[in-house]
Amino acid sequence: MDIIETAKLEGHLESQTNDSTNTYTSPTEAVEEEGKNGKGKPKTLSNGLRKGAKKYPDYIQISMPNDSKNKFPLEWWKTGIAFVYALFNLILTTVMITVVHERVPPKELSPPLPDKFFDYFDRVKWAFSVSEINGMVLVGLWITQWLFLRYKSIVGRRFFFIMGTLYLYRCITMYVTTLPVPGMHFQCAPKLNGDSQAKIQRILRLISGGGLSITGSHILCGDFLFSGHTVVLTLTYLFIKEYSPRHFWWYHLVCWLLSAAGIICILVAHEHYTVDVIIAYYITTRLFWWYHSMANEKNLKVSSQTNFLSRAWWFPIFYFFEKNVQGSIPCCFSWPLSWPPGCFKSSCRKYSRVQKIGEDNEKST
């Protein structure tokens, strides 16, 4: 009787095992069946995965969804276009300064216009040098910060586009209205009276010296409406603050002090009228805020009857640069150059749990 009961028990267990085997589909069979049915491309598992699945059948294959579309594509070629746009307008500005310089009336015939700030504050000679030094420090800080940004290509083309557009506006304003020099201390270079070769030399001198007075390259007059120094001081601070962590308040404060002191020194040096500085600050901040509001809000990227910002002349250019950027850019940093390079990195050192089990099984057998 014991033998008969044991045989019945073994038969019962064998039938249960067969039933469970018939209802269970191994990962390898699932993949092959999927390929046969045409639901996907035929796939085969690696030896490690196959052996690991046989040894440990509780591991089942989970089909992972395809990688979602990158929300922040780098698109460096667009950044290159924005850089060319900014460079063109900067060169155009030097050409326009050279042209306008020939139209500036002599200070003996057209004295400086009345300015309330000049009435209350006397001129300080060294103040303009402080302004230019502050500007160079801010530019240096911004370039360094930009190099460590993870999405530097997107931020870079925003900076180049805004900077180029501001200098395009500056070309227009200084050409249509030529103001007399703000002070009798100005020593303007002599007029060339149609000497094209000498004008080209002046343009190259302005470009090589960055248009700065401390480099001795800015000896021309007429570029008063509006202040290019104020544009640089304001725009670099706005980008530094926007693309740095919010808890870096001390960093923001130092940059704000550099920017504010530089703008005040422009007026203290009597190098620009007060209206030049006010207009430069207003246009720079508004263009920066409008652009980033449109870039961060999906609804503002679409031209519609209710989106009045889409009626700006530069909206098609904005849409070209920002149409693939989904949402606000996170404040992330990364090394400018990865080390070690990708050619020295071995992907064979990375294993999944199942692959590791499969290799252990091979060694044991």
From Swiss-Prot:
Active site per UniProt: 229, 272, 276
**Lipidated positions for S-palmitoyl cysteine?**
331-332, 343, 348
Comp. bias intervals (Polar residues): 14-28
- Example GO molecular function: kinase activity
Q: Which domain of life is it from?
A: Eukaryota
What Pfam families does the record tag this protein with?
A: PAP2_C
**What Gene Ontology cellular component terms go with this record?**
Golgi apparatus; Golgi membrane; nucleoplasm; plasma membrane
GO biological process terms, alphabetically, are:
ceramide biosynthetic process; ceramide phosphoethanolamine biosynthetic process; regulation of bone mineralization; sphingomyelin biosynthetic process
Q: Does the keyword rRNA-binding apply?
A: no
Where in or outside the cell it occurs: the entry states: Cell membrane; Golgi apparatus membrane
Bilayer topology: Multi-pass membrane protein
Q: Which residues lie on this side of the membrane: Cytoplasmic?
A: 291-365
Enzyme Commission designation: 2.7.8.27
Query: What post-translational events are described?
Result: Palmitoylated on Cys-331, Cys-332, Cys-343 and Cys-348; which plays an important role in plasma membrane localization.
- Where do the TM regions start and end? 80-100, 128-148, 159-179, 219-239, 248-268, 273-290
Phenotype of null mutants: Null mice are viable but exhibit increased cell membrane ceramide and decreased sphingomyelin levels. In both skeletal muscle and adipose tissue, there is a significant increase in glucose uptake. This leads to increased insulin sensitivity and ameliorated high-fat diet-induced obesity. There is blunted NFKB1- and MAP kinase-mediated responses to inflammatory stimuli and macrophages display increased cholesterol efflux into blood circulation. Liver SMS activity is markedly reduced (by about 80%) but only small change in macrophage SMS2 activity (16%).
Which InterPro entries does the annotation name? Sphingomyelin_synth-like (IPR045221), Sphingomyelin_synth-like_dom (IPR025749)
The record's comment on protein family reads: Belongs to the sphingomyelin synthase family.
Function of this protein? Sphingomyelin synthase that primarily contributes to sphingomyelin synthesis and homeostasis at the plasma membrane. Catalyzes the reversible transfer of phosphocholine moiety in sphingomyelin biosynthesis: in the forward reaction transfers phosphocholine head group of phosphatidylcholine (PC) on to ceramide (CER) to form ceramide phosphocholine (sphingomyelin, SM) and diacylglycerol (DAG) as by-product, and in the reverse reaction transfers phosphocholine from SM to DAG to form PC and CER. The direction of the reaction appears to depend on the levels of CER and DAG in the plasma membrane.
What this protein is called in its record is Phosphatidylcholine:ceramide cholinephosphotransferase 2
Provide the species name.
Answer: Mus musculus
